[in-house]
């Protein structure tokens, strides 16, 4: 499943994940000439492995990570619905 989230939220989540040597994967759609780039509305597309839980205000997901370097890891996080593209 693919999910488009706000660029600032992606970077905030990535910063925490990188502290655990985990790098969140994005789709090729979010890369321009190999550089991570948000679309014109400020969204980055991430790869969701599994949706664990959903509340009125947020969803808990497992995001893919590590496919670029061949190390399959995942990152579990809550994503507020306010940062998800409609």
PLM features: what roles do these ranges have?
Residues 2-86:
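Feature detects long, helix-prone N-terminal segments enriched in hydrophobes
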């Amino acid at each position: 499943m693919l999910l488009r989230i706000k660029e600032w939220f992606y970077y905030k989540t990535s910063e925490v994940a990188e502290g655990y040597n985990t790098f969140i994967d994005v789709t090729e759609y979010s890369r321009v000439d190999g550089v991570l780039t948000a679309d014109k509305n400020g969204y980055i597309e991430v790869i969701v492995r599994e949706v664990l839980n959903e509340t009125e205000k947020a969803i808990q997901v497992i995001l893919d990570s590590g496919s670029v370097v061949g190390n399959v890891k995942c990152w579990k996080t809550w994503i507020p619905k306010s940062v998800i593209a409609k």
